[in-house]
């Protein structure tokens, strides 16, 4: 799923490890999300949104949105 994770993380000056710690996931999990190799669970998507102070829709593209 297309997302803005790398951009949002870079804007804050965070490393993948920094974001992983905030989300309580591995750095490898953050990398897999940023490179769109894996999609987040619904719970993780909401945690990511909370960490960035944004709505889920502002971070992840909805493939079903026209």
Residue ranges and their predicted role:
Residues 3-22:
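Short basic helix-loop element that most often maps to the first helix and adjoining turn
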Residues 16, 29-30, 52:
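A structural preference for long, well-packed, hydrophobic secondary-structure segments
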Residues 25-39:
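Recognition helix of helix-turn-helix/homeodomain-like DNA-binding domains
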Residues 24, 43-58:
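DNA major-groove recognition helix of helix-turn-helix/homeodomain DNA-binding modules
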Residues 10, 24, 35, 64:
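Residue-level detection of the helix-turn-helix DNA-binding "recognition helix"
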Residues 58-66:
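Short amphipathic recognition helices of helix-turn-helix/homeodomain-type DNA-binding modules
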């Amino acid at each position: 799923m297309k997302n803005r994770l790398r951009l949002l993380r870079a804007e804050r000056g965070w490393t993948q490890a920094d974001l992983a710690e905030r989300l309580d996931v591995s750095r490898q999990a953050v990398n897999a999300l940023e490179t769109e190799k894996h999609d987040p669970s619904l719970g993780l998507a909401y945690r990511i949104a909370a960490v960035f102070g944004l709505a889920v829709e502002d971070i992840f593209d909805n493939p079903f949105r026209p």
